Structure formats: C-alpha cells, structure tokens
C-alpha cells in the first residue's frame, strides 16, 4: 500500500470547508431570511423606499438587532448583489466545466439562468436596477463578476457558431448575450405567467436572440 503524500494530505485537508456548527447554521439561515426579505421589499419599493427596520420587521428582528448582521442598508445591498453575482458566475462555470458540446452547453446555460430568474425574481430586479446604490468597491466587484459571467456565454456561443461553420465576431456575440439578458431579466416586471409556460417562452426567446441569423 502506497503511503499517503503528507503534502497532498495537508492540501486536501486545508481545502475542505469545516461544517457549520448549529449556531453557525442558524446564523446563516437568518442571514438568508434577511436578504430574501430585503430583495422582496427593494424589488417592490426601490432601495430608497426601504429601511433596515422594515426588513427586520418582516423577519421578526428589531431594527437595532439588524446592525449586528449588516453595518448599513448599503452594506446589506452590497452583500445581496455580491451573493447573486457569485451564484451566477459559479453556476455558469459549473455548466461550462461539464464539457458538453457547445449546443448542449448553451442550452444548459439558458436553463440555469432561467431557473435563477424564476426562483429568485426579486434578486434579478434589484440587481438590474440598483447597481448605482452599491459602494464603489462592491460595484467594481459585481461588475467584474458580471463580465466574467457574460464571457462564459460569449465563449460558448462562439464555439457553437464555429461548430456550425458560421462566422460570428466576438463583439457581436457579446451584443447578442447582453440583449438576451435584457430580454430575460425584464420578465419579472411583466404580467404574471404560469411558471412552466414562462420557462418555455423565455427559453425560446433566449435561443432566438443568441442564434439569430443576421445577414
């Protein structure tokens, strides 16, 4: 039996995130509750129309207690939009890393984004509308995360067009991806539609926007 490499063992041990304690789990769950409540209220009333006290009241937390979790309303917004931006970037990377053919990868990216959109519409609304209310540092990081997410799509779209023998310049691929996000991300502000039908419609729209034949 080959003895374990101590360096490799130490590296693996360091890479494993220790499990949360029950107290840590409860704190993380409460934080998610607060962020979800904040997203709902900010999507409905705008960043300026919501106070930390309003958010706390929605989850049974007093105004002063909110400051144990967030330094300010802007700090809460920073964390909210950093969270969703990382989720999109990481989810897109996971799809790309599956190593599927370009057409299947693009389809999986579309389904992934629509799933986030349908299950977390308030976050998408706030992300789309309130970037200017972030601190400069958070704004810079969110935009960097968004650019990396966009480039994941651009790379897959270019690979698909190449596979099909079509010519598509990178700037146009980027325009198509941004336009597609504009279509999808506006849907939470449109009249309500059955979830299954909404997914079908958005998938068709996204595919058409990305693969359109522009002469």
Region annotations inferred by a language model:
Residues 1-29, 40, 164-167, 215:
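N-terminal intrinsically disordered/low-complexity leader segments
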Residues 3, 115-119, 155, 159, ...:
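Amphipathic C-terminal alpha-helical segment
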Residues 30, 73, 80, 84, ...:
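Hydrophobic/aromatic residues within well-ordered alpha-helical segments
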Residues 33, 37-75, 79:
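Helix-turn-helix
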Residues 80-107:
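Amphipathic alpha-helical linker/stalk segments
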Residues 86-89, 137-163, 174-178, 200:
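Amphipathic alpha-helical packing segments from all-alpha helical-bundle domains
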Residues 107-128, 177:
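Helical hydrophobic small-molecule/effector-binding pocket
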Residues 118-151, 189:
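Short secondary-structure transition hinges
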